[in-house]
């Protein structure tokens, strides 16, 4: 395992359609666009785009995923990491200010609070996508689709191990409570298998 690193990502492009979808708006959301724009304008300057991450060895055997520092038990994750000898483990957050805005408008403007929820969800997903793309480009590798605790049969308790090895509170101010909820709430932890060079060459030939 190499050392744990912290990276601040340049603000990803904002996808209005995705934010509206996360906010629960249907296809006919024309009347919500103005509220979305105003909400994003207020939230935008308060957001951060921080990631802490490390590369770990991975050995899979049935539902056991052995990362050296800890083990996770999931057939779905094991299948996802099949063919990889190393894995990128990361935690990402857009910061606590979006939570504060949501709480404030939850009291005075519920519709704006819902829109801010959608913006926060879009922003953290965009951050994860941007980070993974940047990692691939900087390291000349390909990553498998990211896989997070709580998805499929991967226990949410796996969060504890990720937080321990990445030192999330120290590095990016991300904490985990006894109910396994993250704070700030617009945060993600995930595994992304690093495709071995031989497999990458095969994929490139297929393309």
Task: Give, region by region, the residue ranges found by the protein language model.
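Surface-exposed loop-to-helix/strand elements on domain peripheries
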Residues: 104-117, 145-152
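Short terminal or interdomain "cap/linker" segment that borders an active site or interface and mediates
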Residues: 94, 141-207
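Flexible, glycine/charged-enriched surface loops at secondary-structure junctions
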Residues: 49-56, 133-148
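Compact, glycine/acidic-enriched structural inserts
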Residues: 111, 118-133, 137
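Active-site helix-to-loop segments that bind/position phosphate- or nucleotide-bearing substrates
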Residues: 1-113, 191
């Amino acid at each position: 395992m190499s050392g744990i690193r912290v990276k601040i990502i340049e603000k990803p492009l904002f996808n209005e359609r995705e934010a509206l979808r996360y906010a629960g708006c249907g296809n006919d959301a024309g009347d919500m666009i103005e509220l979305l724009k105003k909400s994003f304008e207020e939230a935008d300057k308060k957001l951060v785009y921080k990631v802490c991450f490390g590369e770990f060895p991975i050995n899979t055997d049935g539902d056991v995923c052995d990362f050296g520092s800890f083990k996770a038990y999931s057939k779905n994750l094991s299948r996802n990491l099949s063919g990889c000898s190393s894995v990128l483990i990361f935690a990402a957050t857009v910061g606590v200010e979006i939570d504060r805005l949501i709480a404030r408008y939850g009291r005075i403007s519920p519709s704006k609070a819902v829109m801010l929820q959608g913006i926060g969800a879009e922003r953290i997903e965009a951050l994860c996508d941007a980070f993974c793309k940047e990692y691939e480009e900087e390291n000349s590798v390909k990553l498998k689709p990211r896989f997070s605790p709580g998805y499929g049969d991967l226990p949410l308790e796996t969060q504890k191990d990720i937080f321990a090895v990445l030192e999330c509170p120290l590095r990016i101010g991300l904490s985990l409570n006894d109910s396994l909820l993250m704070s700030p709430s617009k945060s993600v932890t995930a595994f992304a298998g690093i495709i071995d060079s031989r497999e990458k060459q095969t994929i490139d030939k297929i393309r």
